[in-house]
Curated annotation (Swiss-Prot):
Enzyme class: transferase
Any one Pfam family match given in the protein's UniProt record, by short name: GST_N
Oligomeric form and interacting partners: Homodimer.
Name of the protein in question: Glutathione S-transferase class-mu 28 kDa isozyme
Catalytic activity: RX + glutathione = an S-substituted glutathione + a halide anion + H(+)
Single Gene Ontology MF annotation: glutathione transferase activity
Length: 211
């Protein structure tokens, strides 16, 4: 992928594109971050294969274009390309296991999206008092089982990145929800940012967005 121009296309938010962006950042890969407004989306949609975002457009040195679709498939591809899916079969399994656990948590967050405010507040209360704590406990157990300081060992993997992306969604729902609880999750973020100065800078510089 050396010399290729990589463009990540999504709306002006973290959402499903953030794990892709963070994977590229952590790997030290330059990319163009194209953010589309909801107003412009109807006219841009026909130009995107499948008409869905996020999408990644890769243009090689000869002008040949390759489109990549489906957020987790893209993130996994980029992570594998840059040796961020574990170094052994056991580590690969643990990366995928944690990704699955995090996706369960993301599913709960998605229940709150595109809802009227009153309904959103009701759903938020239900999930924060229901499945979310259970899923966070499961994730904490996986973090405790790690053989290193990060999600799987001591090297940054996709599991680390999808985890902090979704934890940010939990705090979007309630900024105080994690305060004083889930020490493994707080320690994981601290260790991750210490392990990847590029990622730490990216997160420090990242503009606030509603999702």
């Amino acid at each position: 992928m050396t010399g290729d121009h990589i463009k990540v296309i999504y709306f002006n938010g973290r959402g499903r594109a953030e794990s892709i962006r963070m994977t590229l950042v952590a790997a030290g890969v330059n990319y163009e971050d194209e953010r589309i407004s909801f107003q412009d989306w109807p006219k841009i949609k026909p130009t995107i294969p499948g008409g869905r975002l996020p999408a990644v457009k890769i243009t090689d040195n000869h002008g040949h274009v390759k489109w990549m679709l489906e957020s987790l498939a893209i993130a996994r591809y980029m992570a594998k390309k840059h040796h961020m899916m574990g170094e052994t079969d056991e580590e690969y399994y643990n990366v995928e296991k944690l990704i699955g656990q995090v996706e369960d948590l993301e599913h709960e967050y998605h229940k709150t999206l595109m809802k009227p405010e009153e309904e959103k507040q009701k759903i938020t209360k239900e999930i924060l008092n229901g499945k979310v704590p259970v899923l966070l406990d499961i994730i904490c157990e996986s973090l405790k089982a790690s053989t290193g300081k990060l999600a799987v060992g001591d090297k940054v993997t996709l599991a680390d990145l999808v985890l902090i992306a979704v934890i940010d969604h939990v705090t979007d729902l309630d900024k105080e929800f994690l305060t004083g609880k889930y020490p493994e999750i707080h320690k994981h973020r601290e260790n991750l940012l210490a392990s990847s100065p590029r990622l730490a800078k990216y997160l420090s510089d990242r503009a606030a967005t509603p999702f």
